[in-house]
Every structure is written in structure tokens, then in C-alpha cells.
A protein has these predicted regions:
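Short, compositionally stereotyped local motifs that mark structural "simplifiers"
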Residues: 19-140, 148, 155, 162-164, ...
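Middle-to-C-terminal accessory/interaction subdomains
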Residues: 102-104, 111-128, 133, 138-141, ...
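Sec-dependent N-terminal signal peptides
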Residues: 4-13
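Conserved ATP-binding subdomain of kinase catalytic cores across diverse folds
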Residues: 106, 127-293
Length: 755
């Protein structure tokens, strides 16, 4: 994979340099991106004189010929008008560099990095070394200094998705004092654009105010991905995390190594991920440190918990209106499982008036977790202790958890969640698979990292050491699940463990949840405790029923256990089709309305019928609540509250017994440009004179009436019948005329014979 790398960073004014109110167009022979071999770069400008240098800080020379690119180089282009230097832009080229990662190129004045006064990366002229804490005080990097830089980001396909000026800051807490540091880049109006407009993390979000270029924090000399791995697991429990994307970082054409692009947890994070306004948003961290909004609601929560005994159900129920207790439980399940001692200083929590006003917790900065240091510790007990027993569990950090555990329902919920998450997301098999996936993703890139970076590389590892750290992750994944299981027993004095074996037949036709956790597998196996009831909800899809286990609680304290194992079978069976003879006849996209037609000769009552509407990424049910009658051979229209039918893939109609009456599937989003149309059956019956119905797009909706096609068909039939009638009349008239003539001829012949 690894070839000779050449990086060219070109800086010039936004592809057009303004000169005396006229545009001066600059043309490059090569576009920014990745190339297999060295090349000559040609730069043309018909109306301006360009100068170039090999960095921001070098002396500029006139550009008279093409430039041969065969090494790592930055070329800065500029144009002067009346001694004014116009805004600079950057185009980066990578030669012989193959990667599965994104690539970031930062270009910044060396003074902004290393100058004693201006430099972000040096202690600075005011700093002094404090031997009591073993780091510099008043260092430049400890302040929120921000410097201008230019950033480019290339995606995994080699396409440039970001190219703009931005602000540059040092990012992190204690990691600021490390020789290698993380960066934050900020989009602001004063730099040009106030957002980084790209799908950085492959999600629907395409506009970011801040991006973190993180060296992996406390893990920066080990794996370079531990926090990204841990938060990828935590996100599967619905917890808020920073999305992550691995990258290679170049600064002024110098390779700095593997960094992770991360979201920043601030007000813009919630605007992006929850589409909520900033008004009414509160964000706090650590011990009541306010990041955004107000802390009044959180102080009220703490005050109530302090003054009330939460073992009293009424008091606990009130607390559930102030905080999302399931979210809080999942947060602590993950944090204690990872044995993360640094959770106290990195607690992040938030609420919004625009949602339900409840506080929720964020999994953040977990680099010290998932290690052998605290692998054998009972973190559940430590983080629910009423006294500070270690440096990482001051009483304020355990206050909420230890008080909530006084409530029996909360305690049982935490035990169940530990079992369910421990049997799924945090099972040994799941953890080993995730570690292997990250190893596969990173191993070739880390080889390049160790072999090609010169800055910071001394005493910072090798591929061999990196693989040893992978082995440590594997040991943790193999041992920690059984340790936390013992921790649960020890902390809550549990007994009577059993193994639940859950098998689901036809899982695509229903859902099963344990303690409100959807079980997506057809085969589930995991440990639980007989002293804690396990809620199970079995929900067949409309048109199906469950013919297996039918209880709402699993408690195998009786003779159901066989060798400490309880086997539960859930089987979803199709109920069959409805005898009702109604059909979906037309779907109007403008109104929107679904039209039904009664093919039967008797009345149909639609009360308690339902529509199932499947979208490209979701689904919903619409119920007919009131009594609605359809006369024989008549139509009924059902309004559907502005459903987006262009995103729909299927509509199904069920009767009051959940039996399927009719369905239609379609994909019309690519074939229409507006909503002034409908999708309809050509005829409302299963066949007419041998013609079968089909569905078509119609630009003349005919709700509660015959379709144009059906009307045309009936008119055609009428014409054909009229033609047949006329033909029959003509034949009949002809036969009568012929018969009359024959009678006349016969009469004349008879008369002549007599005379």
C-alpha cells in the first residue's frame, strides 16, 4: 500500500484574484487530489503576475515555468496589487499515497505554531515550569488562543469535501501539556464560511461549526483509536457520543500522523443531532460547570434528591420527570463496564425545553477505560459509594446514582440493563468482533503512521507495540464480562442466576423486547437473575400472531428451569387474508388521500380497520377509528395527514381482525416532479371482460369517482355494446326485409301458378 508520498499545497486567492475590480482567472493543470506518480504542475494566469514560495514564511519568487513535483512541498501563490496581498487559498496534491482514511491538510504560518508570543505549540514567553505538577504554567497552549489557518479535507474516495480558511486552537484538558496535542478548527464568518459544509461522518448532518482533530487523548502513544472504539459501542445503547472518522493529518506539508476527526460537544452538537433551537438548551459538565444555558434545572434536581427519600415511589416518580433514568442507567452500565476512572471529570449532561426537559448524559473521553489497570475493580460499587474511596470517585460524582439505587425499581432496572447490554453489545463475542474491525481498519494506516512521521515519533511506538496494545484490548474483552457479572452479585447480593435462551421464528414479522430493549436476533442467549423479573413484550406485525410464549414477565423461579436454563420460543404466524372485498383504488399525493373501493354486493364497515404505510426508512399505522360504511360498488376516501408518499414503498390495508385486505407497493419518487398527481388502479375490479387492473401515475386524480381509464373503458364498452346493438338491429332488419321479400315472391309465384 505504501508508496512514496508527495504533497503539494497551493495557496492562491479563491481561484480568482481581484485586480483593479477585474477578475484574474488562475488555471491549474492538475486538480487537487491524489496521483500515482510525479508530474509537472502548470499554472497559467493571462491577466496577472504570480509569485510563489515554498511556505507561508518563505521569500516569494516570480512564477515563470511549470513546477516538477516529486517530493513533499507546499507552493504558495500570491498576487499583489498596490502592495496588497490577496486572500490565499490551498490546493493539495498527494502522489503515490493510498489510504482508506480521510486526509486533512492544514496550512498555517509557522509563527502561529512556534513563535514565543503567537505560537500555539510552544510554552511561550510568559510560561514557567511548575515542578509540583510537572508541567508549564501560563503556557500559550493553555489559553484559548485562536489563529488563522487553511484547512482541506479529502474523503475516503479522494474527493476534496472541505476547502476554506478557519480558526485553529489547541484542544483538550490535561492532554494540552503533552508534547503532541489535538487541534480544534472553527468555521467563522470572518474567515469566509461559518460552517464546514460536508458529510464528515457519513450522516445526514452536513454542516459543522467545530471539528476536533484528536490524537486520541491519553491513548495517543498506544492505539490512536480507543475512545472511538468505546463510543461506537456506547452509541448502540442510544447514548450521545461524538461521531468519529479516522484521518491522516498534514501540517504545512509535513506528515503528523493518524488523527481522529470528532464532533465537538457544545450547543451546535445538539442543533445538528436533535434539530432543536439553542433557546432552552442547558449543557453542563463535571461538578455543575455550565457550558451553555442555565444550571437552575440541574440544581433543582440535586436539591430534590437531597431532600427526598427516593425509596418512596412518589418521590422517585417525580425524579423521572426531571431526568431520563433509563439513559442514566445505560450511561453508568457502559462507564462501569469499561472501568473508566476518568468519568468524574468528563461527565457531560444536558436538557432542552424543546424536547421533554429531562436531563440526559453523554459518553465522553473514555481513553483511560478498557485497560488492565482497573479491569478487576468493582466500579459499580465504587461509583455508588457514599464516601470517596479513590481519587476518581468524589462524593459529588456518585450522588445521583447512589440515591437512585435506594429505589427498588431503579435498582432492578439497572441490574436488568447490565444483563441485557452485557449479553449483547458488551458480550465477549461482540467486543472481540469490534476490536477486530478496528484493527483491520487501522493496521495498514498505522504502519504508514510509524514509518513516515518524523514529528513526535521518538519513543512513541511501533507496529509491534501497537499490536501488543491490541492484545491488551482482547484480554480486557475476554475477562471483563465475567468480572462485571460477579460485581453485580457482590454489589446487590444477588443469587439464582439462570441462562435465558430465546428463539424467535419468523422474526421479520414481529418484534420482541426484553426490558424495553429490542432484540434483533432470532437467537438470543444470556444470563439473568431469578430475583429480578424480566419484562418481555412480544408484538406481532399486523396480519400475524404469536403462537409461542405469551407471558409479559419472565421469572423462572419455578420448575421451568432445566439445568439452570430457561428456553423461550416466540413464533410469528401469518393470520391469512381477509374475506372482505375492498381494494385500494387510488392514492392522491396532493391532498393526500387514500381511496378504497367496495367490490362486493354487500355493505362494508371500516371501523377499526388500519393502514400500514412503509417508508424508505420508517413505517407507521393509521387507524380508521369511526364507523365508516362503503356501499356496494362505491368509493371511500381516507385523509392521511400530509404523508410524504414520494418516500413510501408500500401501503397495506387490514381489517378489524388484523387480516390483510389489500396492498400496493410502488416507487415513484424518481418519476414525478410535483405532487399534483395520483397513483391509481386502472379498474376497481379484479377484471372486466378479461382485462386485469394495473397501477399507473395519473395527473387527473378522480377521488370518490371512476378513474379516467375506468371511465374510458366503460365508454368503450358502451360504444362496443352500441355497435353490437346496431349490428344486431341491422341484421335483424335485413332478415325481416329478406323474409318479407321471400313472402312476396312466394305469394306471387303461388298466384301465377293458380292462374
Amino acid at each position: 500500500m505504501i508508496k512514496n508520498l508527495v504533497l503539494l499545497a497551493l495557496l492562491f486567492s479563491t481561484s480568482y484574484i481581484l485586480m483593479s475590480q477585474e477578475e484574474c482567472e488562475i488555471k491549474l493543470s492538475h486538480t487537487a487530489g491524489f496521483y500515482d506518480s510525479p508530474f509537472y504542475l502548470k499554472i497559467n494566469c493571462d491577466d496577472c503576475d504570480l509569485q510563489f514560495a515554498y511556505s507561508y514564511d518563505d521569500e516569494f519568487s516570480n512564477l515563470t515555468d511549470s513546477i516538477y513535483i516529486d517530493t513533499t512541498v507546499s507552493i504558495v501563490l500570491r498576487h499583489k496589487v498596490n502592495d496588497e496581498v490577496y486572500d490565499l487559498d490551498v490546493h493539495s496534491f498527494f502522489v503515490g499515497f493510498e489510504t482508506k482514511f480521510k486526509v486533512i491538510s492544514l496550512n498555517v504560518s509557522e509563527d502561529f505554531l512556534y513563535d514565543k508570543v503567537l505560537g500555539l505549540y510552544v510554552p511561550g514567553h510568559r510560561a514557567y515550569y511548575d515542578t509540583t505538577v510537572s508541567h508549564y504554567r501560563n503556557a500559550n497552549w493553555s489559553y484559548k488562543h485562536e489563529r488563522l489557518n487553511h484547512v482541506e479535507i479529502f474523503n475516503e474516495d479522494g474527493d476534496r469535501i472541505i476547502q476554506q480558511n478557519s480558526g485553529l486552537r489547541i484542544f483538550g484538558g490535561m492532554t494540552r501539556y503533552y508534547p503532541e496535542k489535538s487541534f480544534r478548527i472553527i468555521a467563522r464568518d470572518k474567515y469566509g464560511l461559518n460552517r464546514f459544509n460536508a458529510a464528515i461522518f457519513g450522516s445526514d448532518t452536513v454542516a459543522y461549526k467545530h471539528l476536533i482533530l484528536r490524537h486520541s487523548g491519553n491513548d495517543y502513544r498506544s492505539l490512536r483509536f480507543k475512545d472511538a472504539l468505546i463510543t461506537s459501542l456506547a452509541s448502540e445503547s442510544g447514548l450521545d457520543v461524538q461521531q468519529s472518522s479516522p484521518s491522516h493529518l498534514f501540517v504545512n506539508s509535513e506528515y503528523w500522523g493518524v488523527y481522529n476527526i470528532r464532533e465537538k460537544i457544545n450547543k451546535h452538537y445538539f442543533a445538528n443531532n436533535y434539530d432543536i433551537p439553542l433557546e432552552g438548551l442547558d449543557i453542563l459538565q463535571g461538578y455543575q460547570v455550565l457550558d451553555c444555558g442555565e444550571k437552575t434545572s440541574y440544581l433543582n434536581l440535586l436539591s430534590y434528591v437531597k431532600k427526598h427519600d427516593l425509596s418512596v415511589e412518589e418521590h422517585y416518580e417525580y425524579v423521572t420527570t426531571l431526568m431520563d433514568t433509563r439513559n442514566f442507567i445505560n450511561f453508568w452500565v457502559h462507564q462501569t463496564f469499561y472501568a473508566n476512572p476518568d468519568v468524574r471529570g468528563n461527565i457531560r449532561y444536558w436538557r432542552s425545553d424543546s424536547l421533554d426537559g429531562k436531563f440526559r448524559w453523554i459518553v465522553y473521553d473514555t481513553d483511560l477505560g478498557f485497560s488492565s489497570t482497573f479491569m478487576n475493580d468493582n466500579m459499580i460499587k465504587l461509583f455508588s459509594s457514599s464516601s470517596s474511596t479513590r481519587w476518581f470517585n468524589p462524593t459529588w460524582s456518585s450522588f445521583l446514582l447512589r440515591n437512585l439505587l435506594k429505589n427498588e425499581g431503579f435498582k432492578n432496572d439497572l441490574i436488568l440493563q447490565y444483563s441485557i447490554i452485557g449479553n449483547t453489545i458488551l458480550s465477549k463475542e461482540s467486543l472481540l468482533n469490534r476490536i477486530d474491525a478496528f484493527k483491520t481498519l487501522y493496521e495498514d494506516e498505522m504502519l504508514f503512521h510509524f514509518e513516515n512521521r518524523r514529528k513526535f515519533q521518538r519513543n512513541q511506538g511501533s507496529v509491534e507495540k501497537w499490536n501488543k496494545h491490541i492484545d491488551k484490548l482482547i484480554v480486557f474483552a475476554e475477562k471483563r464480562p465475567s468480572i462485571t457479572e460477579r460485581n453485580l452479585v457482590e454489589t446487590f447480593n444477588l443469587s439464582g442466576k439462570y441462562t435465558l435462551v430465546l428463539n424467535v421464528e419468523n422474526p421479520q414479522h414481529g418484534s420482541v423486547s426484553l426490558n424495553k430493549n429490542p432484540i434483533s436476533r432470532s437467537n438470543f442467549s444470556g444470563y439473568f437473575f431469578t430475583s429480578v423479573d424480566l419484562p418481555i413484550v412480544i408484538q406481532p406485525d399486523i396480519g400475524y400472531c404469536n403462537v409461542g410464549y405469551s407471558h409479559s414477565i419472565i421469572n423462572p423461579s419455578d420448575s421451568l428451569l432445566v439445568n439452570d436454563t430457561l428456553s423461550v420460543l416466540v413464533s410469528f404466524k401469518h393470520l391469512g387474508s381477509s374475506p372482505e372485498k375492498a381494494v385500494i383504488n387510488e392514492i392522491s399525493f396532493e391532498d393526500p388521500i387514500i381511496e378504497l373501493f367496495n367490490q362486493d354486493t354487500t355493505l362494508i364497515n371500516l371501523q377499526d380497520w388500519s393502514f400500514y404505510i412503509s417508508y424508505t426508512d420508517s413505517s407507521c399505522f393509521l387507524n380508521v377509528l369511526d364507523s365508516a360504511l362503503i356501499q356496494p360498488s362505491s368509493y371511500y376516501t381516507f385523509p392521511t395527514e400530509n404523508e410524504n408518499y414520494t418516500a413510501i414503498s408500500c401501503v397495506k390495508l387490514y381489517d378489524n381482525n388484523n387480516l390483510l385486505v389489500d396492498s400496493v407497493s410502488f416507487d415513484i419518487s424518481a418519476s414525478v416532479s410535483d405532487s399534483a398527481y395520483s397513483y391509481s388502479r386502472t379498474i376497481p375490479f379484479d377484471s372486466i371482460d378479461g382485462e386485469l387492473p394495473y397501477w399507473e401515475i395519473s395527473y387527473t386524480p378522480t377521488l370518490a369517482a371512476q378513474s379516467v381509464h375506468y371511465t374510458d373503458l366503460l365508454f368503450k364498452q358502451h360504444l362496443e355494446m352500441e355497435a353490437e346493438r346496431r349490428k344486431s338491429l341491422i341484421i335483424k332488419s335485413t332478415l325481416i326485409a329478406i323474409s318479407f321479400l321471400l313472402v312476396i315472391l312466394f305469394t306471387r309465384r303461388l298466384f301465377r301458378s293458380k292462374t
